[in-house]
Amino acid sequence: MYAGTCGETMICAGGTNFPDKPMLEGGAKTWTDRIFTLSPGENGWTEAGTLPAPYAYGASASTREGLLCIGGCGKEGHRKDVYLLSTADGAVTVTPFPPLPIALAYTAAAVLDGKVYLTGGCERPREQDCTNRMFMLDARQPDRGWQELAPLPGRGRFLHQMAAADGVLYVLGGIGLRERDGKQARELLTEAWSFTPECGWTRLPEMPYAIAAAPTPTPVSRNGVIYLLGGDDGSGKKYTPQTNPGFNNQSLCLDTAAMEWHDAGPIAAPRAVLPCCAWQGRFAAVNGELKPGRRSPEVWSITLS
């Protein structure tokens, strides 16, 4: 799904679930176009409109103008569409924005100085390939459209994490594809990269272990520490779908001043494949998967020093 903010209002939109019965029992995936909002002081979510079509698995970016829902996919395939969701007097306005140059799902975005940067993702369904391309849109001047920038020097990836801290963008982990026995096989990545518009890409120390699909854009503390909360560390491979206990319940942090990785301890609500946004002095992680095919309706938040 997509989630972010417009002013003091949190907006959630789109997504998928299995409403009738679980995926492992043959349940059919359902796509939704519904939009919900939550404002300070309210006790619950308000349904506030619909997307132009049911979408999911795109990137979310909170800008001064509102929440950008970028790319993703629907039943018909991967999408180039970009929409701005803004709020006024409790209503949500959906405004078409310049489309992506290519269709992308399972991509990631972060905002730096009013500009939205998008990296990676899959161009076609069924994970046939993934890209290392990078695009940028100035949300204050959307008529200029998306500009392609220097690609990530590392592997193409999807379900990776992005963050922006102190004028620097970070691309962390994710999933790459490698041919194995004539087929494309998933490979979790420990690569970490930073990017500045002035200096381009820089390789960072390897992550202690691979993480994909953690809440993104990832939370960043006031002193520039980036947190990867939960996500998929690949440990579920040793279980059957029926015995899978759920996703990684540990967290990692990157101290961007010392450029060092550290364990950050266990988390209460491990999830994967979910958006995250700053809201009311906290970081909110919205819905996501408890384990493959099992969705959560919960929203959890964390306060960072």
Where are these regions (language model features)?
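Kelch-like beta-propeller repeat domains
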Residues: 1-305
